[in-house]
């Protein structure tokens, strides 16, 4: 379980979220860079093209989870299958990295909307808990049923 959490923290680092704690007197303003079913309006490339205007008014941009959701082409990021593959309904990993760099160069940060317990399996035998093994920097990670919250219906129903 520790490896999973360490991996998740690494994922956040990849997205360049590097807060050292939230300052009590923070006066910044955050823009929610997406809305439900806003796939075309919230494409990474489209948000990047608006960086000059957004950077004038906002300090942070809140974006949806960028993890790959398998066969789901229109997914708001709440059914990730692969944590380490950053291709999603909003764009590719390269587009995501380019967008983050553009905003970072203008002094704007990002917050990714990630819920660890929102995870989807690869769909073998129509199961949503057949989580794939993933390898990152030579380390392989594999979630199982024991990694689901103990009061989740899947864990309690066996």
Regions found by a protein language model. Give the residues of each.
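Positively charged n-region of N-terminal signal peptides that target proteins for export
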Residues: 1-4
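Bacterial N-terminal signal peptides
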Residues: 6-16
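Substrate-binding/active-site clefts of carbohydrate-active enzymes
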Residues: 21-52, 56-158
């Amino acid at each position: 379980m520790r490896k999973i959490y360490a991996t998740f923290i690494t994922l956040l680092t990849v997205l360049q979220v590097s807060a050292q704690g939230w300052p009590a007197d923070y006066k910044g303003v955050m823009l929610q860079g997406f809305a439900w079913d806003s796939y075309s309006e919230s494409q990474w490339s489209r948000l990047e093209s608006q960086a000059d205007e957004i950077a004038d008014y906002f300090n942070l941009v809140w974006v949806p989870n960028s993890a790959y959701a398998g066969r789901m082409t229109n997914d708001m990021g709440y059914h990730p299958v692969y944590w380490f593959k950053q291709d999603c309904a909003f764009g590719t990993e390269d587009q995501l990295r380019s967008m983050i760099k553009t905003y970072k160069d203008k002094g704007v940060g990002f917050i990714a909307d990630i819920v660890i317990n929102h995870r989807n399996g690869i769909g073998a035998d129509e199961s949503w808990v057949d989580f794939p093994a993933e390898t990152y920097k030579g380390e392989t990670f594999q979630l199982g049923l024991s990694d689901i919250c103990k009061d989740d219906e899947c864990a309690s129903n066996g």
